[in-house]
UniProtKB/Swiss-Prot annotation:
ATP binds at G140, G142, K143, T144. Residues 69-96 are annotated as: Domain II. One of its GO terms (cellular component) is plasma membrane. Domain I is involved in oligomerization and binding regulators, domain II is flexibile and of varying length in different bacteria, domain III forms the AAA+ region, while domain IV binds dsDNA. It comes from Thermotoga petrophila (strain ATCC BAA-488 / DSM 13995 / JCM 10881 / RKU-1). Belongs to the DnaA family. Its main location: cytoplasm. CDD domains: AAA, Bac_DnaA_C. SUPFAM superfamilies: P-loop containing nucleoside triphosphate hydrolases (SSF52540), TrpR-like (SSF48295). GO terms for biological process: DNA replication initiation; regulation of DNA replication. This is Chromosomal replication initiator protein DnaA. The keyword DNA-binding applies. It holds the Pfam family Bac_DnaA.
Amino acid sequence: MKERILQEIKTRVNRKSWELWFSSFDVRSIEGNKVVFSVGNLFIKEWLEKKYHSVLSKAVKVVLGNDATFEITYEAFEPHSSYSEPLVKKRAVLLTPLNPDYTFENFVVGPGNSFAYHAALEVAKHPGRYNPLFIYGGVGLGKTHLLQSIGNYVVQNEPDLRVMYITSEKFLNDLVDSMKEGKLNEFREKYRKKVDILLIDDVQFLIGKTGVQTELFHTFNELHDSGKQIVICSDREPQKLSEFQDRLVSRFQMGLVAKLEPPDEETRKSIAKKMLEIEHGELPEEVLNFVAENVDDNLRRLRGAIIKLLVYKETTGKEVDLREAILLLKDFIKPNRVKAMDPIDELIEIVAKVTGVSREEILSNNRNVKALTARRIGMYVAKNHLNSSLRTIAEKFNRSHPVVLDSVKRVKDSLLKGNKQLKSLIDEVIGEISKRALSG
């Protein structure tokens, strides 16, 4: 009876699905018209209940009659199926180290990477659903982050699965070493028998290396045929992997191919904030926005720019303003890329530096004496030294025309009354403007 039920199920699913989802599946017991199935993995149990309920229901009814029912139980030990080896066994989980910072939570999603992100997340949640998953994109766009996020997610949520993350260079070196030492069988055992999820980074490194491609081809086939999840990253799409064996390229394309596009400006700003958060650092918003707007080659350089500013801040004890950031990051920014700084934006930055009041406070509704004085100095200098229009000043300072006029008048009256402290601050602001103008 047990074999009839299993055979009936097998006829209702394709070979690939049988090997992937039913390899650890067995009939545990039959009591009257109720069948109890068992599986050795909790994820597979939930997947079968969700996706194969109808198949299982029809199969038991064909064998036991229309009143037949079933349930699926999860058992940690191996079922007694004679069909194939179980998909999952209890073993050490993480076979190679992963960067704990590379998680889905730390990955900022935007229009250019949304598809790849969700594909990777689905693979992490449901290993085998998209197999293989091939992620490609330019340098520093987040391929390694996504690849290791899959590994970190599985380690946290699927304790039965064995995860291996490797670069293709490591795969090559391991192969060469095993051949030199006469341990090729051990190499194949390691990569083909002791892995449930294989994550391969920078596969383009194997271009032109025919011997290792052949080994990878057979490794791929054995893992895939056993229902093991494979995820591959490359800097180019499969069909552009020149000097790769056609049969290997076709394997890369048989699952899901996802591209990572360069992030747009808004996504880069969000990524910059996330990087700052991970580094436990603080930078003014205008500085962070400047970095995101101008360092757009790749995310590694974006992170490098942020770290450089944080190191400067920590080692000098100085706050990093926009002008300082421009000077510090000249090697990160393409020539002629930096836009000329708006005169009033630069003025506000200078006023903040001279008075010790932050840019945010100057532009806020804070009416304490220090913030109010700094705000009025800024509007006064903008009107009388920069010759800016009332409309422009009002827009930049988030104030109405009457407020701007009143602020300018109050500063002028105070200067006429001989307020030396106010005059000193204004002179320092104007002096800094002149100095910056001369330095270009």
